[in-house]
Every structure is written in C-alpha cells, then in structure tokens.
Amino acid sequence: MKRLLTLKTFFAAVLAIVLFTLYFTPPVMAANTEDLSQLLKDNWCVSFLWKQCDLIAVDLQGANLQEANLSGANLSGANLSGANLKNADLSDADLSRANLANADILGTDLSRANLTEANFKSTRLWDANLTLANLSRANLQNANLLDSRLWGSNLAQANLTDATLHGADLQYANLAYTNLTNADLQSFFFRGSKQVTNLSNANLEGATLTGANLRGALLTGAIMPDGSINEEIGFNLN
C-alpha cells in the first residue's frame, strides 16, 4: 500500500510538471519550425520560461519568427538581419547591439525592450510598439517607423537620418542629441505636459515637419530644418 501511494505521488508530480509546461509554453503558431529549432539549438533555454532563454549572439539571419513569443529573451548581439518578426512578442527582451537591419517588424511588440546600440538600418517598423523601449545610440538610418508607438522611449543619441516617422507617437520620448537629418516627421505628435518630449540639441536639419505638432517640446539648442539653432522651448508647425 505504501509503495502504491509512492507511485501515485510520483505520477501526480509528473502530470503536474507536464500541465505546468503546457500552460506556460508561449505560442509560436506562425513561426517556422526549422527556424525555431535553430533558435534553440546549442543555446540553453527553458521553453516555458523565456526569461531564462540565453540567445546571446545567435545567428538568425533571415529567420521566420512571425508571431513568435520571445518576451524577456536575451538576444543581445544576435543577428536578426532580414528576419520576419511580424507581430512577434519581444517585450522586455534584451536586443542590445543586435543586428535587425532590413528586418520586418510590422506590428511587433518591443515595449520596454533594451535596444541600446541595436542596428535597425532600413528596417520596417510599421505600427511597432516601442513604448518605454531603450533605443539610445541605436542606428535607425532610413528606417520606416510609420505610425509606430514610441511613448516614453529613450532615443538619446540615436541615428534617425532619412528615417520615416510619419504619424509616430513620441509623447514623453527622449530625443536629446538625436540625429534627425532629412527625416520625415509629418504628423509627428507631442503633447504639452510637465513631462515634455526632449529634443534638446537634436539635429533636425533638412527634416520634413509638415503638420508636425511640437508644442511644448523641449528644443533648446536643436538645429532646425533651415539650419538655425533654436533657443525656444517649443512651437507648433501647421
């Protein structure tokens, strides 16, 4: 009888572990199976706990990770150039110094992600969620951020040369010392507040500001589209 109870306890424990794993395993419905296998190969990951997923410097160039859940994963220094990350969940992930050049990041959740010094050159970030993301010193040259959400994001010293920010929401964002030379800022939106958007010392030379609302933005020392240096707090371009 005692042995029977021990076996029952053992099988109950195994069943509990299986159910726990199934419950917490992240959805990867549209992600390519081979690419996901490559993602896990030779890397230590706990499939149901992505925050323990160590994918530092992994090579996923051109991988199909559409709708994959990599929330909280460590992808610092990873090569994701040309990868399909449409509608993927990368919230809270570490992508510092990662290469995402020419990647498809349409509708992707990158909220609160660490994107310090990441390379987004010529990347499509349409409707991406970059709320509270850290993009300091990131390369966004020629990137398309159409209708992206950058609420409260840190873009200090980022390179946004020739980038498209048409309709982007940068309320409360930090763009101090950011290079916005020749960027498209049509319908760029800020909201006057005690927590103003910081564009101090940013370079806006040659930028398109048609319809941009910069009222309340901090523009002290910013180089304006005509090359002049602004000394006012903010203004509205209609």
Question: What do these predicted ranges mean?
Answer:
Residues 2-13:
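Bacterial N-terminal signal peptides that target proteins for export
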Residues 17-27:
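C-terminal segment of classical bacterial N-terminal signal peptides
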Residues 31-238:
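Tandem repeat scaffolds
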